[in-house]
Amino acid sequence: MDIVLEICDYYLFDKVYADVFPKDGPVHEYLKPAIQSFSEINFPKLQNWDSFDTNSTLISSNNFNISNVNPATIPGYLLSKIASYQDKSEIYGLAPKFFPATEFIDTSFLSRSNIFREVLSLFIITTLFGWLLYFIVAYLSYVFVFDKKIFNHPRYLKNQMSLEIKRATSAIPVMVLLTIPFFLLELHGYSFLYEEINESTGGYKAILWQIPKFILFTDCGIYFLHRWLHWPSVYKALHKPHHKWIVCTPFASHAFHPVDGFFQSLPYHLYPLLFPLHKVLYLLLFTFVNFWTVMIHDGSYWSNDPVVNGTACHTVHHLYFNYNYGQFTTLWDRLGNSYRRPDDSLFVKDQKKEEEKKIWKEQTRQMEEIRGEVEGKVDDREYIDQ
């Protein structure tokens, strides 16, 4: 994310922050007392576990006893342990890395490394990029890929597409806000993101291996999170809004409850905190994830691959609720006994209208049976055939 942020700072934000939040300007003068008070806070520090005796240390290493715990030193110890994972050379904003310094770089009291500026910048960038990617990819999928016969499906909702768009556009900013702490960790050197491609980092071979590792790790994480989201109490509170869409359009891809979307994005953010990942590949993979999310909601069934959890598999999930929780592969569904093979009828092209209606009727019958078990008798959806 530091690459994107520095591009935006260089071409736009440095000047904007200099104009809106200049040093010694009205906003700065108003906030100076609060800034001064914050800077004078004495945060606890602890340099080394072994340098403290039993009178002042967290715990005596020679005489371990819970009664020897000194609560006053716990925050300092935890802070020192956290700091030991920080790569200070990766802290964003201390010095430009990719572009020369602009004439405005030091003219705002909100410097590039200021956490409040970072939060605001990240929120603006990620929200706008999220909206842009969502609308562009979903629109292209709708025009060129989406099977518009779905509009006639008995479980298509009244005004469904506009409802999907409304849900997605309102959810994206909240999802961004919830994920900003992960971006801040990356910007402050608490991740394994790197930019140099050389022998010490494994070269291009390591980068190629990072792709399947990222897919497998996130596929596993999302599978278990998705199953958790189908626990009855969690489903009712968080995941049900996404299952409002029994049959989907590409615009359903991001139509989540924002907290649901946040939980399902966690594996993507955890991966670079745990494993090495090239910074450019990181951005490409995040873009790919958004493409994939749209693709599996586009209602176009190209392949019945036994390994890839494609559009057909995800259609089964929306129709029948309790199957195909995976994101990219069918591996964890097979291991977790939740895999359901898509019906062959999904892959028949140019089906006769009467046969299609018969298939949809059977889908609806099975769906209603399972929906009743998952959601209860009352269904608050408004279908086109009502």
Curated annotation (Swiss-Prot):
It catalyses: a Delta(7)-sterol + 2 Fe(II)-[cytochrome b5] + O2 + 2 H(+) = a Delta(5),Delta(7)-sterol + 2 Fe(III)-[cytochrome b5] + 2 H2O. Residues 214-337 form the Fatty acid hydroxylase domain. Pathway: Steroid metabolism; ergosterol biosynthesis; ergosterol from zymosterol: step 3/5. It holds the Pfam family FA_hydroxylase. One of its GO terms (molecular function) is iron ion binding. It is found in: Endoplasmic reticulum membrane. Belongs to the sterol desaturase family. PANTHER family: STEROL DESATURASE (PTHR11863). This is Delta(7)-sterol 5(6)-desaturase.
